[in-house]
């Protein structure tokens, strides 16, 4: 069989099989036994998640005030370092291994690296290997977390993450620099398809937090929750999201709940559903619409792979739904909401606003505006939807 390409993906038979098994030191009867066992395999083979109980302290959430403006990746890094310090060297605590591919400063895992050096694994520019090693490590009694740019941590290594799903690993992937928000890095580095890629799997959970406060809580939740979980966030600094009274929306009493939509502003003249950092432009558009006598309901969806049925029902009752996202409009939030509406048999005016081509290179605001996704574009499109 050596040096014969015919055997790529093809099993040896007859005398070739007998010789191969003898050379390997196995009985040739194993082949027949395997064929018999196949007859007994159920139609659906269950996935068995990696064994083990997570014993890790995630601590109290940091609180970012209404006057704070910072990036979600820094909030993630701060929360990660907090958790590391609470557990590093503590007997009986599940180790938290953090993997990096030469980007610790950009993805904000450098603080963790300084505080917990033995738990920090620098892999170099080896994304495929890192996805595999981090997934495998999570089945060995540790919590694995890998932070990288969106195009490297998911687009580049999609098959490895698909195999992590098949193998039931316990990996936490944090994607920074996603969407058009990356701006100057241009179309090659603007990850605009992460929700669609993870929707192709059956076990991955996805969280796209709105601001630093929600990012902090989602990070701590992901670390202590079994299973494969992805957090996705942009690069830009964001204001803390507030309620109508000016208090942080995700304040001290807020607890992250996977799949729960966030009510940002009350209203009844249609519903605007935002994902991730776009909710900040959504608030600006909402204020403009209210000044013009239109008061829509404003929602934020941080978990686009999981529908909040109660929130969707309330949105339908307003008579019009517009989704707003920094993501491929055909595979992200819009498609998720539209499919669920169709499955429920709902009749409602609907429009999806999202990325519809590869982006340009420039400031985040300029690139988003050139895609027709500015807050002014949102106001205009929403008014057109109501007029239909």
Label the model's feature ranges:
Residues 1-232, 236-238, 242, 251, ...:
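Thiamine diphosphate
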């Amino acid at each position: 069989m050596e040096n014969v390409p015919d055997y790529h993906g093809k099993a040896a038979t007859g005398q070739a099989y007998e010789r191969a098994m003898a050379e390997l030191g196995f009985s040739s009867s194993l082949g027949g036994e395997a064929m018999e066992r196949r007859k007994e395999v159920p139609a659906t083979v269950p996935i068995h998640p990696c064994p083990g109980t997570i014993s890790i302290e995630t601590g109290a959430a940091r609180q970012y005030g209404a006057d704070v403006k910072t990036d979600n990746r820094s909030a993630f890094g701060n929360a990660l370092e907090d958790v590391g310090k609470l557990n590093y060297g503590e007997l009986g605590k599940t180790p938290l291994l953090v993997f990096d591919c030469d980007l610790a400063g950009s993805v904000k895992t450098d603080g963790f690296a300084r505080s917990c050096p033995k738990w920090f694994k620098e892999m170099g520019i080896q994304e495929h290997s890192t996805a595999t090693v981090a997934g495998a490590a999570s089945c060995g009694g540790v919590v694995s977390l890998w932070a990288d740019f969106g195009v490297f941590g998911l687009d580049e290594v999609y098959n490895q993450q698909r195999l992590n799903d098949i193998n039931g690993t316990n990996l936490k992937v944090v994607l920074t620099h996603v969407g058009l928000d990356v701006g100057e890095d241009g179309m090659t580095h603007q990850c605009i398809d992460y929700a669609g890629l993870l929707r192709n799997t059956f076990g991955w959970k996805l969280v796209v937090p709105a601001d630093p406060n929600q990012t902090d809580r989602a990070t701590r939740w992901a670390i202590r929750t079994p299973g494969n979980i992805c957090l996705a966030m942009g690069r830009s600094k964001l204001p803390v999201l507030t309620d109508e009274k000016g208090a942080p929306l995700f304040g001290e009493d807020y607890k992250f709940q996977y799949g729960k939509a966030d009510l940002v502003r009350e209203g009844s003249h249609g519903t605007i559903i935002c994902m991730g950092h776009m909710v900040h432009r959504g608030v600006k558009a909402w204020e403009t619409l209210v000044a013009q006598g239109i008061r829509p309901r404003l929602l934020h969806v941080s978990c686009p792979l999981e529908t909040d049925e109660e929130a969707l029902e309330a949105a339908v009752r307003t008579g019009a739904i517009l989704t707003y996202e920094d993501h491929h409009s055909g595979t992200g939030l819009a498609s998720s909401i539209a499919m669920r509406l169709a499955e429920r048999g709902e009749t409602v005016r609907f429009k999806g606003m999202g990325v519809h081509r590869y982006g340009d290179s420039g400031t985040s605001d300029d690139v988003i505006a050139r895609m027709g996704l500015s807050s002014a574009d949102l106001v205009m499109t929403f008014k057109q939807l109501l007029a239909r």
